[in-house]
Structure formats: structure tokens, C-alpha cells
Amino acid sequence: LDYNKLLGRDPISTDLNTIQDYIKGKRILVTGGAGSIGSEIVRQLVKFGASTVTVFDNAEASMFHLEQEISRTFSKAHIKYVIGDVRDKYRLEEVFDSFKPNVVFHAAAYKHVPMMESNPVEAIKTNVLGTMNVSNIAYMNEVEKFIMVSTDKAVNPTNIMGATKRIAELYTQFLETKSATKFIVTRFGNVLGSEGSVIPTFIKQIERGGPVSVTHKEVIRYFMTIPEACQLVLQAGVLGNGGEVFLFDMGEPVSINDLAKNLIKHFKSKAKIEYIGLRPGEKLYEELLCDGENMVPTEDHNIMKLNHIDYDFKTLIPKIEKLSKIRSNDFYKILLLMKSIVPEFKRENND
């Protein structure tokens, strides 16, 4: 399956030499390193000559499979596989003490919108408090750069997952104001072929003979392939001087309805499309910029930098502390607290 043909565009290319020059010889930590994005970041870091890559993840099966693959492909790679959770700051402190990373790529997160609507406290624990743990320890250890993998769903969020990622973005920008560590945020859209994403889901439905579930005929999304997304994250890490939010040129948004039709045609299937309606927290289209943000070009034409927006960081920490103390899925209380941190957070398609 040619993903770029499916997207109707050429692959996005970036300057691999500048990435290699920066990565070579570095000690690097990748949180969520066994996931779809994290594992590809790990592969590319090994290719670019990182001296040591520490893979940190709580998914032991995925970690095992990655270890088996890497040992076959890169027999001399210096990789450490560490089971742990970003919620556990003591485990993270051990990792930083043991491996002393120069650079951190933070990819650990919960990403599934409907699942997080049902489990908002878990989204807060991982996406907000987990990011705080990793970034705080990076700050205390004076790590050179901290690159957070974020999402376009953090822009004017309409769901719990997007709101938690926006809060995490804000926290890293707060740390940037008082840190020697350069904190950098990267935002991109849906990643083709990642675990649980639309393409694998559609393919499974087609293999079963259908129906293929599309939420709405007019839904459009921005897409990138996994290698594209990871190379651009690495390049943004090279370009970043701290405090930036980087946005990638993902081409034109893609109709999910057309994507389903093209896949059915590709597999010569007779499966029908079933329109199931937008799920809680979903939009017809994703936005690229928060209110008040403007894009500025960088030296890489595939990457845009967003200007800073004013935010009262003095109020951020007390509000996050209140959020962290919620122990039950008290949806109304969670929504009110999140909206006090992210005023542009507006619910859609909910009771």
C-alpha cells in the first residue's frame, strides 16, 4: 500500500545531513519509545549515529518486538530498553541518573479521542502529569533539548485528549521561561499506519467484508506517514532554540470518505461504507493555529514556527495542581478546570 499515492502527494523530504550532524554522538532518551512514533524515532536516531538511545515505555510486548527488530537490523547499536511509566517520577529519576541523556524526545501519550473521553483522569495523569514529570527532571538535569510530540488536536481543542496535550504544551513553554534546557513543541496531524489509526482500522473492516465505518461524509484530516513525521520531529529538534511550537507542512487535508473509497477500490472489495456519526469530542476538520498564533517560515520550507502567544503562567501551576488532585471521572469538574487553563476548549458532539 503506497501511502503517498493514497494521500495524492509526493513524500515530504528534509535535510538529513543537518539531523545527522546534530544527533551523532548524543545520548538520547525517547519516552513512549516502543509506540508507533517513538519506535520510528528510535530507528532514525540509531541510523543518524546517536551514541546511546534509551527507549522508555510501559508496553513490554511492544518493547520486546522492537528489541528483536533492532538487534537484527542494527547489531552494533547502543540501545537501552527500560520498562517504566512517565507517571512514575522516581523511575524517571533513576533513568536520568543512569543514562544522563543530552536530548529527550517525549512521545509518551494517550492519543485515542473516544477512549480518553471515557477516561479523562487517565488522560490527565499521562498527558499532563507525565509530561510534567519528564520535563521537570529534564530541567533539573539541565538536558540540552526537550522535544515534545504534540498534535493538531491541541489547537482549539474540542475533546479531553486535545485539551490535555494543549496543557502539556503550555507547561513546557512555562519551563522554557526559567530553564537552561531548550523546550520545543512539535505539532502534526494524523499519522498513517500508526497503531489504532484509520488506515489499519479500515483495512481490517474491508478484510471482514465491511461495512467500513466513516463518521461523517465531510470529515477531513491532515495526514503524514510515520517516517515523515519522525524526520520532521528530529529536524525541528535541530532548528529549535527553545520556546517554539513547530508546525509541519502536511499538504492538503484528506477526505476520510474518499480515503475509505480508495482503500475499498485498492483491495477490489465490495464492502459498503456505513456513516456512524461524529463521536464525542470529534470535529469535522482540525485546525492548525490556536487563537493569536501566527506562522513564521523557518530555513526548512516544510516546517513553520509559531509565534508566542501571551499566557499568564503564574496561574498555570495552581490550576494544574487542582487538576492533579481529581481522583474520579467527575466530568463536569474536569471540564471546568481544563477550560480555566485552556479558555478556547469547547466541547462538540456531546450530551
Per-region residue spans from a language model:
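N-terminal Rossmann/SDR dinucleotide-binding element
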Residues: 1-100
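Conserved residues in the N-terminal Rossmann fold of short-chain dehydrogenase/reductase
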Residues: 82-83, 125, 216, 275
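Conserved Rossmann-fold NAD(P)-dependent oxidoreductase catalytic core, especially the SDR/UDP-sugar
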Residues: 106, 110-169, 174-176
